[in-house]
């Protein structure tokens, strides 16, 4: 706490010295890296990225801690700082993103959007790492994917569900609400990756795209007939006003499974 307060004062009074001082402290006392990063972000966020880079350069193993500390101290600058650190150390990007999701979830969407827009091909990997670290941030992560890399929605959704089935419902709801047209494809990909999360996926899709719930329920049940009952239950719980239509559509598509579905 003392190191954080001291760095905040230094960054505000003499910003040109912040990065050099941060690097020196990280070399002498690596356990203080997170506090130093947070202090700079609080005192003068304009130099937070430069200081974070100096800290990570002096202590690469603390990259995730540094990114999370900055995001916690000043969420508004989290995306800029994390992106700069990721550019300097690409191999630590997923760890940094996961740390932000876990310890500074309020900055998760902005950080995910910035990192994924810089490297759309990494959308699934980053989504997976962040959702595994904090399933409660899955909605924010999914929103970021839909905003900057919608073409990666299905792959990212599946990666999140596989990494942490508890993230499935929030991710499915957010993506289905943003683009109902991809809901069926996304739900099928998630079901394939994490069949044990069928009920959560179905509930999320129904909450996000209630008008398409019956149609999507049928496609989900066709993709995995053994999960039909879980799909029906999840859909009905989230869109109970449409439960009759959902069950009727599923029963019509799979008459032999009517008992389990009902």
Regions found by a protein language model. Name each.
Residues 1-262:
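General marker for long, soluble alpha-helical cores
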